[in-house]
């Protein structure tokens, strides 16, 4: 069996007047993430990791922020399409390990919900999706609550 590893990263600025979506679920928060799509940094990092593992470039290549059809798109659609893209190359998702870096809102209570959504979209077991949350202890742009970042590592396998 052939396996490959990918790494992804994304960051978006926090602004007023936008909804906050993380891991495919909506959070009630006074700020949301600015972006061409719904700006779900966790899903974007996972997409980049999957595409990188399959040597298929990155999310901006497949879903450019200059394309009108992706304006305000639900990132869950992007993840489902990314899984289809790697499947067309003969790969399936093995597992995901991801971290969201944000001071607020506190994410711990909703991590299981994110795991369920992500597992469903990637057609894998929920036990194969790890989502963690951390802060930067008030340091940097994340600590000043100017933005949220996410990191993801994935393993993909040649489909049999």
Swiss-Prot record:
EC number: 4.6.1.12
Protein's job: Involved in the biosynthesis of isopentenyl diphosphate (IPP) and dimethylallyl diphosphate (DMAPP), two major building blocks of isoprenoid compounds. Catalyzes the conversion of 4-diphosphocytidyl-2-C-methyl-D-erythritol 2-phosphate (CDP-ME2P) to 2-C-methyl-D-erythritol 2,4-cyclodiphosphate (ME-CPP) with a corresponding release of cytidine 5-monophosphate (CMP).
Catalysed reactions, semicolon-separated: 4-CDP-2-C-methyl-D-erythritol 2-phosphate = 2-C-methyl-D-erythritol 2,4-cyclic diphosphate + CMP
Pathways per UniProt: Isoprenoid biosynthesis; isopentenyl diphosphate biosynthesis via DXP pathway; isopentenyl diphosphate from 1-deoxy-D-xylulose 5-phosphate: step 4/6
HAMAP family tied to this protein: IspF
Disulfide bonds: none
GO molecular function: 2-C-methyl-D-erythritol 2,4-cyclodiphosphate synthase activity; metal ion binding
Pfam families: YgbB
GO BP of this protein: isopentenyl diphosphate biosynthetic process, methylerythritol 4-phosphate pathway; terpenoid biosynthetic process
Cofactor binding, per record: Binds 1 divalent metal cation per subunit.
Annotated organism of origin: Phocaeicola vulgatus (strain ATCC 8482 / DSM 1447 / JCM 5826 / CCUG 4940 / NBRC 14291 / NCTC 11154)
Gene giving rise to this polypeptide: ispF
Matches recorded under InterPro entries: MECDP_synthase, MECDP_synthase_CS, MECDP_synthase_sf
Description of how the protein assembles with itself and partners: Homotrimer.
Record-stated family: Belongs to the IspF family.
Residues the record marks as site: Transition state stabilizer: 36, 135
Cofactor: a divalent metal cation
Positions of a divalent metal cation binding: 10, 12, 44
Signal peptide positions (record): none
Residues the entry annotates as binding 4-CDP-2-C-methyl-D-erythritol 2-phosphate: 10-12, 36-37, 58-60, 134-137, 141, 144
The protein's name: 2-C-methyl-D-erythritol 2,4-cyclodiphosphate synthase
PANTHER family registered for this protein in UniProt: 2-C-METHYL-D-ERYTHRITOL 2,4-CYCLODIPHOSPHATE SYNTHASE, CHLOROPLASTIC
């Amino acid at each position: 069996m052939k396996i490959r590893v990918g790494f992804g990263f994304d960051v978006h600025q926090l602004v007023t007047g936008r909804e906050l979506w993380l891991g495919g679920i909506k959070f009630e928060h006074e700020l949301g993430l600015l972006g061409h799509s719904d700006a779900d940094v966790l899903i974007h990092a996972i997409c980049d990791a999957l595409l990188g593992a399959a040597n298929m470039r990155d999310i901006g290549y497949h879903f450019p922020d200059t394309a009108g059809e992706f304006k305000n798109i639900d990132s869950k659609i992007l993840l489902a399409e990314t899984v289809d893209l790697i499947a067309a190359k003969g790969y399936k998702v093995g597992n995901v390990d991801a971290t969201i870096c944000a001071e607020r809102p506190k994410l711990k209570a909703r991590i299981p919900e994110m795991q369920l959504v992500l597992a469903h979209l990637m057609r894998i077991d929920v036990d194969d999706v790890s989502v963690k949350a951390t802060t930067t202890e008030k340091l940097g742009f994340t600590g000043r609550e100017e933005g949220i970042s996410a990191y993801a590592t994935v393993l993909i396998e040649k489909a049999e």
